[in-house]
Amino acid sequence: MRIILITGISGSGKSVALNVLEDAGFYCVDNLPAQFIPDLARYLASEGYTHLGVATDIRSRESLEHLPDTVRELAETHQVEVLFLTASTDALVQRYSETRRRHPLSILTDGVPGSDGEPAFNDRALMEAIEMERELLSPLAESAHRIDTSNVRTNTLRSWIKELIREDSERLTLLFESFGFKHGVPSDADLVFDVRSLPNPYYDLALRPLTGRDGPVIDFLQAQPMVLAMAEDIRAYVEKWLPSFIADNRSYLTVAIGCTGGQHRSVYIAERLANYFRAHGNVLVRHRELAPAT
């Protein structure tokens, strides 16, 4: 049986994800304590079911500590995947403000109704509840496939989940490619970032024969605030728009990073980005002027 467990921060889209599973033919259960999942899986398997989707979250907080053990037990006889949905605190506060729903851990301000007769939320208490939930769930996030929905519309999230659960496809593969502009821009690049404005190790004679993978060059570039800022901006851009590319049913997304010769700056940035995004799934690195894809 294929079992997908959905957990994560309240308000991050778990209900949307569970609905996608149900539409795809999964037998779905919401808010099921973790310790009950193995018995349910055994029963459903005996009845001929092959797909199970379960959402478990802070509403069953006492049982969450059992989830890692539950996953290990299920994995002995089933195909098990864990999706952890999250979002920024600002995004979550905005969503709760729009829906007027209570956070499971939120504290109401003296229980006094607002002008519309509904309980008045204390935004500070809400943010504290969100951060408390993050802390409680952080052990689960570390071992799950994390999905950040902060900047993701509902339709995009649905498409993303559909892609993740497809039986006949693998995840999108991110390819980070360094190159030198003097040799031309890669024709297969989906996104191109120009880092030629960054400080250039080429002008240090001791660093000139090295590459962006060598320690002295890495130390040089990491000491430059401008380099770190540009790397962070590129990372944020790719991470924000990655769901759109996944929803487009792509197999690969090629992100090209170019400097003058393709030896120092672009190599360093490509390696730095690849190291970050490896937590998201399949990642390749290609240094066009140095070596083939790895």
UniProtKB/Swiss-Prot annotation:
> Under what name is this protein listed?
Nucleotide-binding protein Reut_A0350
Role this protein plays? Displays ATPase and GTPase activities.
InterPro entries to which the protein is assigned, alphabetical:
P-loop_NTPase, RapZ-like, RapZ-like_N, RapZ_C
Organism encoding this protein:
Cupriavidus pinatubonensis (strain JMP 134 / LMG 1197)
Question: GO: which molecular function terms?
Answer: ATP binding; GTP binding
Record carries keyword Isomerase: no
- Which residues bind GTP per the record? D57, I58, R59, S60
**Is the keyword Ligase assigned to this protein?**
no
Family from the record: Belongs to the RapZ-like family.
Q: At which positions is ATP bound?
A: G8, I9, S10, G11, S12, G13, K14, S15
Q: Which UniProt keywords apply?
A: ATP-binding, GTP-binding, Nucleotide-binding
Q: Which NCBIfam families match?
A: PRK05416.1
